Amino acid sequence: MKSPSPVKQSGLILLGLFTLLLRYPITPSPTGTDNFYYISMAKAIISHGQVFWAEEILSLYGLFPGTSPLGATLLASTVTTATGLSIYDYILIHSIFLSLISTFGFFMLSGELTDNYRSRWFAALCFSLAPRFLTFSLWRFSPRFTFIAL
């Protein structure tokens, strides 16, 4: 496999930098109403050391009445405990990292439809600028965003 030309490499770098620029936080705290619910769940897991409200195995997947999926919440509490980051710092890193993964993942996915570099780049740019994706990835912690990004 030959390496891409310098113009294509710089185009991908610019796409990544533009994605980072769009996700730069403009508020002093995370946004979204569900966000604070998931933050309190992660803090409860950290302080108690267990998921005390998940009594059924289906609760972990959000398939039991009154529960929500715990994958992203468990990941957040595990990473903040292991690294010593605050939950807010983790959410910022989480949203930026997943937005980069999903933007470049969409670039690779569009490569299945066309071999034209410009079309792939433009499709990834449009995905990165989509209003719903922007609201999910702007300093927000949501299991839906984790599912969409991956």
What kind of feature is each model-predicted range?
Residues 8-11, 17-149:
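Active-site lumenal/periplasmic loops and adjacent helix-entry segments of GT-C-fold
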Residues 1-5:
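Membrane-embedded, hydrophobic transmembrane alpha-helices
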